[in-house]
Structures are given as C-alpha cells and as structure tokens.
C-alpha cells in the first residue's frame, strides 16, 4: 500500500472533464438504451485511461475523476438511507446560469444499512496505485450535507423527520464514521472534504441564504466547523483529511464570491484538517492576508490556476502570487493546484481535455520552479 500523503507541491482537486464516450454511455443508460453493466464497463475504461494520463504528467495523486457521479456532492448523499431525489424544475442559481441538478431532500432518518457506493469506487482506483502515486477519495464535507438539509429551501421538509438539528447532526456524524471506516479498511489514507458552505458564508448576501443576519452567520460557521471536526475526530489517526473550500463551479460559472476575511477565524483557526485547498484564481477570492489565521502547522494549497477558462495563466505572475502568499504563511507550508475541479458536475467547464491537461502541466512547471 502506498504511504504517500497529500497534498503534494503540485496537486489537483479531483474532478476531470468526462470523455465523449463516457457522456454517450451515460446518455444511453439514462434513456434506457443500455444497462448498468455496459455503463460501468465504459466508466472503468475511462478511469483507467484518466489515471494513466495523470501518471504520465508526473502527478503523485490519482482519483477516478468523479466519472461515476452526476455531481460532486449529491451522489454521495444519495448513497444514504433516508435521502430522496427527483429531477429539478428550478435548479440551483449560479451567476448567469442555473445548475439543473436533482432536488435532494430528507425522506427519513439518515442512515447506512449497506456499504456506501463510494467505497467500491475507491477500491477500483486503489488498485491503480503504484510506488509513485496514491489514491485520494473526494466527498462533500459533513457541513455540506448539513447545509443541504437545513437551509431554508429544505428546512420545513427536514423538520418532518428531525425535531432539532442535533439529531440530524448526530446521524450525519454516524454515517460519515461508517463510510470513513470502510474506506480505511479498503486501504484509503487520504480523504478530501469538499465544502461550499464557507464560500456562501463569505458572500455579502450569505446571511440571506441561511435566513439570518451577518452577525447570526457566525453561529452557523461554528456549527459547520463543529460537525466537520466531529467527523475528523472519529477518523483513524493516520487518515489524512484535507478540505477544498469552493465558491461553486458549474459550467464555468460560480455561486458565491467574497474574501476569506469573514470566515478565517473559524475556518482557518479552528477546523482540524491537515490542509486547505483554497480558490485564489480571481478577485472574488480577495487577498492572502487571511492566511495568517491558519493555525498550527496546517498546509495551504493555493488554487491559482483557474479551471473556468482555457486561457493559460502567466507563469511569472503566478510565481509572484505564491511569494505574496508566503508573507502570511511560510513557503514550505504552501502548495499549488488548479482552483477547483474541471467538472464538478457531468456537464464540465468550458474548456477542452487538451486545455485541461495544459493547465495541469503549467501547475507542475510552476511548482517545480518554486519548490524544486
């Protein structure tokens, strides 16, 4: 088993553009023109090809590209008992576009009566490891699941099952423990919790999304930090748990904007992760000063290369920004990656596979120049 630990000096978030043959296989399956066995065969082939390409580029971490998912987060929730979903009529609002992902809601107590599908997904990638690579498993954070079922659009429905948030939180913590323990038994030692809640908290209208005031939002921050920390505390001690803080990433659009200043004390100071993958690809993310709040010896992966546009960043400008960030956190605790995945949902961002690989080549070139 590989003993490598994430993050690496040049790294990536996790999702990749779906190849055309996978999109076609998914379309045929959804339309009843093929069965699951045929779909899985194509998924397997595409994942093997993806991992081979990642290795060819010289990266030390591998994922399945999230090729078996419709979205980065909802598929994970669909794997639990007590969670239902139906095709949406309105979608989720992004800037300039709505993400037409399934409405997902509580239909009973959240539980896990059988192995979560993501565990078998991980086993497939684990088998593709070699001495130079390690598989990581991405999943939405516990806070993301809590937000999904407690934000105003779902609150009344959730209250039909749960009398208070503590009951819901306890059930979420319990199912995460089962999933993480099963992943550990399958050989997983690197997990990434993807989390859009902090991006919403940082947005100037974030409080309205939670039906509270700017001051009241601090209590929500603490609740989300607490549930993440409870899950982290339950994990095996040698399980590396990182987090990716996102502002939404659908078809090259975004859901929230705002600097990290308003969430830094709680997120950077009190969340007990090993490393933060942070978006810093444009002015929506603000400056680097909040990084001074990153406590202990936690690491920061700077997401300075955008996945929302095919245009390649200026290498020297990125290098300069890395050194700017090192004014607030030592260079030896900094790393580099794209700002997000390339396809948080099946539709993917507006660039080609070739442009996607060019982005990863650039990340590696810059990281090698900065850190050697």
Which role does the model predict for each range below?
Residues 1-372:
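Domain-level signal for soluble alpha/beta catalytic cores
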């Amino acid at each position: 088993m590989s003993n490598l630990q994430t993050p690496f000096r040049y790294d990536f978030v996790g999702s990749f553009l779906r190849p055309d043959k996978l999109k076609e296989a998914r379309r045929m399956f959804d339309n009843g023109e093929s069965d699951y066995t045929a779909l899985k065969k194509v998924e397997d082939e595409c994942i093997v090809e993806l991992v081979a390409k990642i290795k060819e580029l010289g990266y030390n971490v591998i994922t399945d590209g999230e090729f078996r998912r419709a979205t980065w987060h909802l598929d994970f929730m669909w794997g639990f008992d007590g969670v239902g979903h139906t095709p949406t009529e309105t979608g989720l609002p992004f800037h300039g576009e709505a993400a037409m992902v399934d409405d997902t809601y509580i239909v009973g107590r959240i539980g896990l009566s059988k192995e979560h599908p993501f565990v078998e997904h991980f086993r497939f990638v684990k088998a593709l490891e070699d001495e130079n690579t390690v598989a990581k498993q991405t999943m939405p954070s516990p806070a993301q699941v809590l937000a999904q079922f407690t934000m105003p659009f779902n609150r009344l429905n959730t209250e039909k099952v749960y009398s208070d948030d503590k009951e819901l939180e306890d059930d979420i913590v319990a199912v995460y423990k089962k999933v993480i323990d099963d992943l550990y038994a399958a050989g997983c030692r690197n997990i990434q919790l993807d989390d859009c809640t902090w991006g919403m908290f940082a947005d100037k209208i974030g409080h309205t999304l939670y039906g509270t005031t700017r001051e009241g939002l601090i209590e929500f921050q603490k609740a989300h930090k607490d549930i993440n920390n409870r899950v982290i505390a339950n994990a095996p001690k040698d399980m590396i748990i990182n987090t990716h803080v996102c502002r939404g990433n659908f078809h090259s659009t975004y859901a929230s904007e705002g600097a990290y200043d308003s969430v830094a004390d709680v997120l950077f100071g009190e969340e007990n992760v090993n490393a933060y993958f942070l978006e810093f690809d444009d002015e929506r993310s603000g400056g680097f000063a909040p990084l001074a709040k990153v406590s202990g010896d936690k690491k920061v992966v700077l997401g300075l290369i955008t996945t929302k546009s095919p245009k390649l960043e200026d290498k020297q400008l990125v290098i300069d920004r890395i050194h700017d960030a090192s004014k607030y956190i030592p260079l030896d605790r900094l790393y580099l990656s794209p700002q997000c995945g390339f396809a948080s949902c099946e539709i993917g961002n507006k660039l080609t596979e070739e442009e996607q690989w060019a982005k990863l080549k650039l990340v590696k070139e810059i990281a090698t120049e900065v850190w050697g």
